Amino acid sequence: MVAFVKARRQIAGVKESKSLLPLALIGISLLYVGLIIIIPAANVAVQAFSEGLSGFIKNLGDRNLQEAIRLTLLMGVISVPLNTLFGLAAAFAIARKQFPGKSLLLSVIDLPFSISPVVAGLMIVLLYGRNGWLGPLLESNDIKIIFAWPGMALATIFVSMPFVAREVIPNLEEIGTDAEEAASTLGANGWQTFWRVTLPSIKWSMLYGVVLTTARALGEFGAVSVVSGSITGKTQTLPLFVEEAYKQYQTTLSYTAALLLGGISLVTLVLKALLEARTGRQSRIH
């Protein structure tokens, strides 16, 4: 009888410890996220409004901040469409064709994931800078790449290149070629097949890649910092402006710009979640 009671107590203790373990893990996770993300993000918002709403609006009117916003949006407008077109073309080549160097192309697409953005910026400087391979040719034709927006655009395009291709490739491989072959049999040409058959099947994964590309392009710091020189009012995107304003002890202005970047990140996160849910439903349907 005593042994039975001891066994019951041991079993109860094990059950209690098992029930406490998930709660402990949840608590640790929430504490970690709170310390690393939530509290710092909340502090940015508080500091941005430390001078009140009028001070926040005044900071938004800062000429250098507005120029940084304009340049940040310009980088997005240039890089996102180009990387979307490249991503679609590369995805079709990899998923639909067999050719020498296919594995190499896939590795090159993944290169921006593994290489440091600072190294990427340095690569662009060594190619297009005054002492670079193409520097003398560009200078003789009065074409400025480094310390100007074209170099910033090249850096942004490089770091945000893989996302559309990497999202569309598995989608194309999953849907196969049956529908495209059927459309071709019925007399549709290549463009008609793409617009009416293929694109509707990959649109959500493509949009998901576009959202990731946009987030990466607008938030890039390292590569753009190297090629731009971070000249206030001329070659500063929002991330560069945040750093420079903070170093110049314009803390409220810096937090205002950081809050704008945080707002962009929040919008991106919401769109990402919506597209993840949509692509999940689409995969279950297929």
From Swiss-Prot:
TM stretches of this protein: 20-40, 74-94, 108-128, 145-165, 207-227, 255-275
Keywords: Cell inner membrane, Cell membrane, Membrane, Stress response, Sulfate transport, Transmembrane, Transmembrane helix, Transport
Record's note on what induces expression: By sulfur deprivation.
Superkingdom, taxonomy of origin: Bacteria
Gene Ontology annotations for the cellular component aspect, listed alphabetically: plasma membrane
Pfam family, any one: BPD_transp_1
InterPro entries: CysW_permease, MetI-like, MetI-like_sf, Sulph_transpt2
Membrane-protein topology: Multi-pass membrane protein
Gene3D superfamilies: MetI-like (1.10.3720.10)
Domain ABC transmembrane type-1, chain residue ranges per copy: 69-272
Location(s), subcellular: Cell inner membrane
Annotated GO MF terms: ABC-type sulfate transporter activity
Function: Part of the ABC transporter complex CysAWTP (TC 3.A.1.6.1) involved in sulfate/thiosulfate import. Probably responsible for the translocation of the substrate across the membrane.
NCBIfam families according to UniProt: 3a0106s02, permease_CysW
Family: Belongs to the binding-protein-dependent transport system permease family. CysTW subfamily.
Annotated protein name in UniProt: Sulfate transport system permease protein CysW
